[in-house]
Amino acid sequence: MIGFDRPLKPEWIYKTLQLVQPGRKPEEFYEAYNNIAVELTGKDGRRKTRTVLFRTFIYSFQEFTSIIEDNILLSLCKQKDLDYMKPILLAKFIMDYDILRFFTQKFYQIFDSSQEVSSSALTAKMVESYGDTEIIKRSTRSFLRTLCNFKILMPINSAKYHQLPKTALSTKQVRDILKLYALTNHTKQIDIQNLDKSIFAFYKTPDLNAVAKENNTLDWEYISAVDRRLLLLK
C-alpha cells in the first residue's frame, strides 16, 4: 500500500504544474519547486513533498519518468486559475491513493457537516480497518493537513478541526474531473450511476446527469438506461 507521506498545498502543485514543460527532464525543475515551496525547511521535507507531487500529477500519466510528458493537468493549470483547479487537484489525490479513498469514506461515516472533526476518532477508525501501522497514522495526519491547505477544514487545535462550508463545483469542473477520472483509470467509459463519489465528497456537486447531458456529443456520448448511465468518452 502506498502511503500519503507529506501534506501538500494547492499553491505548490498549481505553480509547479504551470512551470514544468513537456519534453524536459524532471530534475530541471527541482530547484524551481524549492523556490515555490518556500515554507518548507530542510532538504528532506522538500524532497519528500516533491516526490509526492511529481508521482501524483506527472508520473502517474506516463510509463517512464526520465522525460516529462504532457497531460491534462499540465494543460489545465496553464489555462485555468487556482480556484478552478483546487477541486480537480484534490480529486486526483483521492483517485490515486486507496488509503485516501478509504479516509474519505470513513470521514463521512463518522462526521456530518455540523460536527467538529476529531483526528483521534478518525485515526482509530482507520487503524481498526487497516491495522496499527505508522503508514496509516502518518497518511491520516498528512491528509488532514492537506484538507486544511485546500480550505476544506480549519484547525481548532492539534487534534480537532472545523468543517468549512462546501464550495459549489461548476459543471465545467465536474466535466474535467470526469475526464481526469477516465484518464487515471485508463478507460473510455464511465458509469456515472455507479461511480465512486468520493472524488466529489468535499464539494457541493451538481447533478451528474445534468453534466452528462450538457456535454453530450462534445466530450462524450451519453447513454442513459435503467441500470446505468454511461459516458463514452471521445
Set out the residue ranges of the language-model regions:
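Eukaryotic partner-binding/assembly regions in large regulatory complexes
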Residues: 1-94, 105, 117
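Positively charged, polyanion-binding regions of nucleic-acid-associated proteins
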Residues: 11-20, 89-116, 170-191, 198
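Short acidic, hydrophobic short linear motifs in intrinsically disordered regions
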Residues: 26-33, 113-127, 187-200
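Short helix-coil junctions and helix-kink-helix linkers
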Residues: 34-44, 124-135, 193-206
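Short amphipathic alpha-helical segments
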Residues: 49, 99, 136-139
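Basic amphipathic alpha-helical segments that dock to polyanions
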Residues: 51-56, 140-150, 209-221
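Conserved binding-pocket/active-site segment within a compact domain
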Residues: 109-177
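Accessory, usually C-terminal, subdomains that scaffold auxiliary metal cofactors
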Residues: 158-232
